[in-house]
Curated annotation (Swiss-Prot):
A Pfam family matched in the record: PsbL
Transmembrane regions listed in the UniProt entry: 33-53
GO (cellular component) term, any one: photosystem II reaction center
Membrane-topology descriptor: Single-pass membrane protein
Annotated localization: Plastid, Chloroplast thylakoid membrane
Keyword hit for Glycosyltransferase: no
Role noted for this protein: One of the components of the core complex of photosystem II (PSII). PSII is a light-driven water:plastoquinone oxidoreductase that uses light energy to abstract electrons from H(2)O, generating O(2) and a proton gradient subsequently used for ATP formation. It consists of a core antenna complex that captures photons, and an electron transfer chain that converts photonic excitation into a charge separation. This subunit is found at the monomer-monomer interface and is required for correct PSII assembly and/or dimerization.
Subunit structure: PSII is composed of 1 copy each of membrane proteins PsbA, PsbB, PsbC, PsbD, PsbE, PsbF, PsbH, PsbI, PsbJ, PsbK, PsbL, PsbM, PsbT, PsbX, PsbY, PsbZ, Psb30/Ycf12, at least 3 peripheral proteins of the oxygen-evolving complex and a large number of cofactors. It forms dimeric complexes.
Family: Belongs to the PsbL family.
Name listed for the protein in its UniProt record: Photosystem II reaction center protein L
Keyword Thylakoid applies: yes
Species per Swiss-Prot/TrEMBL record: Stigeoclonium helveticum
GO BP terms, alphabetized: photosynthesis
Keyword annotations from UniProtKB, A to Z: Chloroplast, Membrane, Photosynthesis, Photosystem II, Plastid, Reaction center, Thylakoid, Transmembrane, Transmembrane helix
Gene that produces this protein: psbL
Length: 54
């Protein structure tokens, strides 16, 4: 292993946590996405309810 390579085993958890996030995009959950998500959960709950309550 050359001098420039970094062994992943010697990187501590505090170094990983303290690194700044390079992706600064804002996570958005608007009303349409919320409705689609709730509809998906509801449809999946109806479909799998026969297996759960059998």
């Amino acid at each position: 292993m050359s001098q420039n390579e970094v062994d992943i085993n010697i990187i501590s958890l505090s170094e990983v946590v303290s690194r700044p996030n390079p992706n600064k995009q804002v996570v958005e959950l608007n009303r349409t996405s919320l409705f689609w998500g709730l509809l998906l959960i509801f449809v999946l709950a109806v479909l799998f309810s026969s297996y759960i309550f059998n």
